[in-house]
Amino acid sequence: QAETPTYHLDQELRSFANYANFKPTIGSVTDEARMRQIFSTYRPELVLHAAAYKHVPLMEHYPEESIHTNVLGTKNMADLSAFYQVEKFVFVSTDKAVNPTNVMGATKRAAEMYVQSFNEYLETNHTKFHTKFITTRFGNVLGSNGSVVPLFKKQLANGGPLTVTHPDITRYFMTIPEACQLVLEAGIMGNGGEVYVFDMGSPVKIVDLAKRMIELSGKKVGEDIEIQFTGLREGEKLYEELLNDH
């Protein structure tokens, strides 16, 4: 549904002569009729489902939209994948789905539960071929749209300050290539029902990341560029977890 990122991806892929056999298609996962048309036309063997609303504070104000896209949109894609006998369905989830404290995390957890339950139902009730549903959980992807690094870069370019919500807030990070690798490996290795979590090492304090970026820009923390603490936003955790308590 995001037209501009789709356009940029189209342009990037067209620069690779050996990878010209693709067709960008605009549509929303919440539009079941449109998605059915796409499945019927292209008959995919693999579905990588990454469509979601992801910004925690924004979704606190629009829970109905988060449910519509993150839960019902995922249900549409999962149901159609099973109907059109897709071989594997990889659902891209988030560490915010673990013991969720906000709307976005709760909707992603609900979507995880649907995908896993659907896989179990198909395994139990269909002895012949059925779609295998696999889940991957991401931390924060460095450099992705709306992530903290591009924000800090913009704030640095404007002379600061760099805004951090809390001095103790930490996050897990992974790079874009690592995120892509996790999704592709899950699609290859998964046999249905698994939840794959990438080893992202130790969590990073956001204030330390801010200090490091200031130093890398050749500036001094507190002299040239200030760090400003703005307070935790609605639904925001001090730290994220990778695995559920249960």
How would you label these PLM feature ranges?
Residues 1-43:
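N-terminal Rossmann/SDR dinucleotide-binding element
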Residues 24, 66, 89, 133-136, ...:
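Hydrophobic/aromatic anchor residues within beta-strands of the central parallel beta-sheet
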Residues 29-68:
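NAD(P)H-binding glycine-rich loop region in Rossmannoid oxidoreductase-like domains
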Residues 30, 72, 139, 170:
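Adenine-nucleotide cofactor-binding loop residues
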Residues 103-107, 141, 175-176:
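The catalytic Tyr-centered alpha-helix of NAD(P)H-dependent dehydrogenases
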Residues 128, 151-174, 178, 182-206, ...:
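A conserved pocket-lining segment of Rossmann-fold NAD(P)-dependent short-chain dehydrogenase/reductase
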Residues 189-246:
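Mid/C-terminal beta-alpha module of Rossmann-like enzyme folds, strongest
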